[in-house]
Amino acid sequence: MSGEPRKILVTSALPYANGPIHLGHLLEYIQTDIWVRFQKLRGHQCTYVCADDAHGTAIMLKAEQMGITPEQLIDQVNADHRRDFAEFLIEFDNYYSTHSEENRELSSYIYKACLDAGKIATRTITQAYDPEKNLFLADRFIKGTCPKCKAEDQYGDNCEVCSSTYTPAELINPRSAISGATPIEKESTHFFFKLPDFQEFLQKWTRSGTLQPQIANKLAEWLDAGLQEWDISRDAPYFGFEIPDQPGKFFYVWLDAPIGYMASFKNLCARRADLDFDEYWKKDSTAELYHFIGKDIINFHALFWPSMLSCADFRTPSAVYAHGFVTVDGAKMSKSRGTFIMARTYLEHLNPEYLRYYFAAKLTSNVDDLDLNLQDFTLKVNADLVGKLVNIASRCAKFITKAGGKLSPQISEPELIEQFLSKSDFIAQAYEDREFGKAVREIMALADLANKYIDEKAPWKLAKEEGKEQEVLDVCSVGVNLFRILITYLAPVLPGVAAASAEFLNAPIVWNRPLEPLTDHAVNEFKPMISRVDPKAVDAMVDASKDNMAQAPKDNGKAKKDKKEAKSEEEIAPTIKFDDFAKIDLRIAKIVSAEHVEGADKLLRLQLDIGSEQRQVFAGIKSAYAPEDLVGRLTVMVANLEPRKMKFGMSEGMVLAAGPGGKDIWLLQPDSGAQPGMQVK
């Protein structure tokens, strides 16, 4: 590493304090933790803070249902979150709560700064109101019959069966999801942040390199359409911070939630003499500030948040990094249907480092969704971590122990060692760029070389020959040094295995200076570092999750039931000859660009890179995908389909997708490692 150590502050989005962590949440915290551990391993002062998002109507109502106070609920959830994160080896420098005095003070300060700057408006609005509970109802707290498909028990703003959107007033037989009462309309005075006043600032900021291209393009659409004022207030009863000088009015949870990043850091600064709040948050700060978030909350972090910070004379983020969602075996996760695996359920059955590695192997810097394919998960972890990585150390250690437990005084293969060390900068840059999958592929390619070297030298055969003791020690000492380099590169991903490796190697894992090979160095007895994934344990985890799903509320909408039955009854097509199938040329394609087609309700225009050329394809996937979410993705296309002339242009192939249509369309996506132009066989 060269240059002065960087000062970096990193955050992950705040998990909501009304329930447990699940695998969909964990993608973000694992991604962030790997990046932070990498920065620390490289010698930088990198600080990682987070907190529970602990305000809002949902928390107030859940506490009431449980017969406890909101404070008791958020304390209980906070303890559960801390426990689960710790067991997944997520190492926060501070994990706090938005329900804190630091956050109250900072939220009030920022609000008053915006008020003094003339950026807060006041006006009267009409909302749905529960006359029994005496509270205003957000759309999600109103249920009724869909006005389009007549499915029952649908939310106040959208139908989960037919995907229609509407207003609560259009809902048939609306009722409060809290009390069952019929809502009435009632007026209230609300406070609004004048976001349109920051249009010019945001147009520049969102194009300044702070966002991924796909995200910047999406925000450009919103900016071009014109920004609306943002309602930052809620009426009592509400669990949160009361707005200064406005009795009965509270800050909307999304106002004080991101300020929770600042509050958590301020709380840490009070306990750490080496950290200064202003050094990281003042307007002219030279420290780096990064937010890792899900793509679904980008509007709060890339529009509202930088605008409020700028208005209150604080610095804005160096970058906001968004990621996609987690799917399991190709299906979208859904809380309402219970199709997710809880963090605690996973931990009861499997090693957390399995998931850390699998996520890392598939993570890129873009916003594509990540699929947790459980069969691939088992095969990949067993092949890479057990069959390749740890196998190197276990194959060599017993011979070194037999020779006295000390490595050879010389390195017999300096060129091979140098080949491994020469990849340091490439792998480090991949981590820096959040291209974890690229880093993992390079590391595993090196692991293959290390195992090939040991196979060719066959120390187990040499050990049977008289007078070959030194050669055996030389070979195995090279193997152990290669393992040390590999585990150094993987330490951000596998901190537990790295710690066990450091114990075996009798040397710390360091990556902030050139690695010198270990020679004439005593190592400790080798102990198993990670075991194979047991498919039965995976099955047991899935079964336990199914038990959780069975306890979830059942859907009463006949339309949804009919829809599911229709999916399952789709018949297999008639049998064809193999020669007929062989005529189809399927290729890996990279989506270079994607855009709406004027005048087409269902089509997106895709520009596809298939290695030797680019093709234009019109795909009927508009109902399921936003164009900006597709750019950079790999998919599969029929490359030898006769071009079809359409009124919008020539379509030069077909991309492959699954699903019945509407929002239920899933574009095929190959595993990481596939390259544009590769033939699918």
From Swiss-Prot:
Q: How is the cofactor bound?
A: Binds 1 zinc ion per subunit.
Q: Where is this motif: 'HIGH' region?
A: 15-25
- Predominantly, its location class is cytoplasm
- In Gene Ontology terms, what is one molecular function of this protein? metal ion binding
Q: Which PROSITE patterns match?
A: AA_TRNA_LIGASE_I, TRBD
User: What does the entry list under GO cellular component?
Assistant: cytosol
Q: What is its EC number?
A: 6.1.1.10
Signal sequence range: none
User: Which stretch carries the motif 'KMSKS' region?
Assistant: 332-336
Biological role stated in the UniProt entry: Is required not only for elongation of protein synthesis but also for the initiation of all mRNA translation through initiator tRNA(fMet) aminoacylation.
Protein's UniProt name: Methionine--tRNA ligase
Q: What organism, scientifically named, is this protein from? A: Hahella chejuensis (strain KCTC 2396)
